[in-house]
């Protein structure tokens, strides 16, 4: 008999107990699942002699809200540049989700920002993202940051403006040339380019 119970992603103690893959799955890592997914069925089954299999196969999604684990407060598509809290690019953004999550966990507080401009912000002509949330509401709620210049955006994020501007400059060079000497990204399109005019957007993310 095989018993499937829905996992234990909301149980920090169990995550830490069985984790053999990730650098950290503590309280600072939210879950995209319901808070009710606490592994009770697994605990009860084990108590009556069930054999547990694959408990270490814990998947992370790299682009969740750091506080809630939700995915909907999102601006910026898959072509967008990702930078850490210091404003530095740290990964090939087109890597597999496990590579992206592992790279994010190595950054300060496990936090990163997706930076986008007009052509790659994933907003429709009326200002709604792909989840139906309006950009003005996201900005008002502090879920997304918006600024007319990259320097102003960096200040909102607590970064050195010069560092963010330089990261974007190098990224744009890679987009234009199709060659990314820092992280080996080879998949680019014209929408990946961060434009030289605002508004610019940033949403803070971490793995969940």
Can you name each region flagged by the protein language model?
Residues 1-63:
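Glycine-rich loop(s) and the adjacent beta-strand/alpha-helix scaffold that form part
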Residues 5-9, 46-49, 119, 157, ...:
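Structural signal for hydrophobic packing residues in well-ordered secondary-structure cores
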Residues 10, 16, 31, 60-63, ...:
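Generic structural "secondary-structure junction" signal
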Residues 25-28, 134-136, 164:
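A short, structure-level motif marking secondary-structure boundaries and short turns
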Residues 38, 42-44, 48-159:
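An anion/pyrophosphate-binding glycine-rich loop and adjacent beta-alpha core
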Residues 163-208:
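A glycine-rich dinucleotide-binding beta-alpha-beta segment and adjacent secondary-structure elements
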């Amino acid at each position: 008999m095989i018993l499937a119970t829905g996992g234990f992603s909301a149980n920090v103690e169990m995550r830490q107990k069985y984790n053999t893959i990730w650098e950290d799955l503590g309280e600072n890592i939210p879950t995209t699942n319901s808070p009710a997914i606490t592994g009770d069925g697994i605990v009860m089954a084990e108590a009556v002699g069930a054999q547990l299999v694959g408990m270490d196969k814990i998947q992370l999604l790299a682009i969740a809200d750091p506080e809630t684990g939700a995915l909907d407060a999102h601006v910026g598509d898959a072509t967008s540049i990702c930078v850490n809290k210091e404003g530095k690019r740290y990964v090939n953004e087109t890597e597999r989700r496990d590579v992206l999550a592992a790279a994010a966990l190595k950054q300060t507080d496990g936090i990163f920002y997706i930076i986008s401009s007009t052509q790659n912000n994933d907003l429709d002509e009326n200002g709604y993202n792909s989840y139906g949330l309006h950009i003005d509401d996201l900005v008002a709620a502090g879920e997304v940051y918006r600024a007319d210049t990259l320097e102003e955006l960096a200040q909102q994020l607590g970064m050195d403006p010069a560092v963010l501007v330089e990261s974007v400059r190098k990224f744009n060079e890679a987009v234009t040339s199709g060659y990314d000497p820092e992280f080996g990204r080879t998949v680019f399109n014209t929408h990946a380019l961060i434009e030289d005019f605002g508004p610019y957007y940033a949403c803070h993310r971490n793995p969940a």
